[in-house]
Amino acid sequence: MDQTPAHEQHNHDLLTFIPGDARKIVEVGCSSGALAREYKKINRDCQYIGVEYVPEYAQLAERYCDSVVVADIETIDEEFFQDTLNCDCWIFGDTLEHLKNPWSLLSKIRKFIPDSGSIVACIPNVQHWSVQARLCCGDFRYENSGLFDRTHLRWFTRQTIFEMFNEAGFNIAEGAARDLNEPGRDKILTAIRTMAVSIGADPEMAASDALPLQYVIRAVPA
């Protein structure tokens, strides 16, 4: 699992979806520990465990996490999951798209997570209008960050996010779209509506699903 560069900023929208009274949290891809830093201001008694693939990032995260496991979450041993049996919340902040098989990992977590537990995740939206516009002219070039981040292995839309969690045994209890009022999108959205009509799809749904840059969701065991 490749990671994007560490930074000290946290995802405020993701933070608001984390249960405020969690006793144990596992954050996969904790990077510099910025989210742990902010959550500890809300709930300092929580046991906050970070999982980080990059040793240099893990060292930074140790400033704020109670413990940090340096490992690839997809190859970590079964004992780790046994130790998280009473984990209230798993966090994937822009992480699932970096995994080889996020479907398998979510299914594994479902076997161990308590019925009262939850997964909080932030996931990029590949249906974003800018992606569709670039694909229209064959411009699929990897970049160092953003929707075309070269470290992304998987891509999701609103629909396939629901499918991924449902197939793993979770229901999405709540969610929010991270939508920026970006210039130049209106003409593209008009074209997206026209394209949707041409294939018998709902034009307004197609345009609505093209707005979010990312989705933040909270999933619970089904």
Model-predicted regions and their roles:
Residues 93-98:
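Short catalytic micro-motifs in class I SAM-dependent methyltransferases
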Residues 99-100, 123:
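A structural helix-start
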Residues 100-104, 131:
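Short N-terminal helix/helix-N-cap motif within the alpha/beta-hydrolase-1
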Residues 103-118:
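A short glycine-rich, Lys/Arg-flanked "PGG" loop and its adjoining helix->strand segment in the class I
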Residues 121-142:
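Conserved class I S-adenosyl-L-methionine
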Residues 143-160:
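Acceptor-substrate binding/catalytic loop of class I
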Residues 161-176:
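A SAM-dependent methyltransferase catalytic signature shared across enzymes that methylate proteins
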